[in-house]
Every structure is written in C-alpha cells, then in structure tokens.
Amino acid sequence: KDVVLLNLIGVRVVLVHGGGPEISEMLEKVGKESVFLNGLRCTDDETMDIVQMVLCGKVNKNLVSMLQKAGGRGVGLAGVDGNLFEAVRRDEEHGNVGNIVDVHPEIVLDVLEKGYIPVVSSIAAGVDQTMNYNINADFAAEKLAIALHAKKFILLTDVKGLMRDFRDEDSLIREVKMSQVPGLM
C-alpha cells in the first residue's frame, strides 16, 4: 500500500525483485537441491529454467496483483524485456549467474511515463543474446537505480540488511550513501 501511495502522490517508484525462497521451494518440489556459493545460488541450465519460471511468472505476477489490489497500476517486466539488463557470466562455479554490464532503462522510463509502477524480475539477457542469466536482485536494483539517476534507493529484504561480510551479522551497515555502494560490491 505504501508503494501505491507514493505513486499516487507523484513519486516514481520502481520495484526490482528476486524470489530466493520461492525458487528454493520450487526446486525442492521437483527434487533438485539448492546450492549456494558465497551467498549466490549456483544456477545450472535446469535451475535457470525454474528461476525464470518462478521470477518472471509466479513472483512477478503476484507482486503486480498485490499492487493492483491496493489500487495501483503495476506492469510486470523481466530484465530481458527491452534489453533492460545485459550481463556476462560471473564465473564457471556459479553457472548461469551473471553480472550486469549494461542497463538500457528506456522500457522502465516508458512505463513510468504512463503512470504505471514497473515491477522488474532480476533476469538478464547475455550480451551476446544467446542465454539469460540469474542476477542477484539487490545488484540488479542497484544498477537500475544508478541508470535511472534515482534520488532514493530503498532496499526491502528478508535479511537483516547490507553487511560488510554476509556471514557476520555484526557487520551490518546501518546507512550508506549511493556513492559508497559500488565500493561495497
């Protein structure tokens, strides 16, 4: 409801989401183990299919529906739509996990211009357009905020917060300036 209210008073809100718990739940349903390395999901081809189904389908459309039930007007997008996010493979160990190297925010700007709330899933097209990549939603949100020259960046998460060391809850960073974010990645 807060997002809808912000939109109604003229604040241009963009939602970027992941769906880790929902992906893990679906993987479990199909008998596939979730594997993580350095806090990121290792994503082979089969896992990537499930990641895309869950993020671009279930999670994205549920968020759009929630916005609309609250009186907002949401539009679901994936990072591959309009070539929004372009990525390269992070490394071999993580499989189809990518790092965003370019952002083309025109589709998001078009949606915002029409008064809708863009809801973006964190899937990116490969630079060579031969495959898609699973992108950490926090990283995708940061890259999009920079490309949009966002005045505010609000991170909603199911974890305690931004950590200097993700394994150490005492390393929580309570406040950060946008200019400091790249150095934390």
Explain the meaning of each model-derived region.
Residues 1-185:
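Nucleotide/pyrophosphate-binding catalytic subdomain
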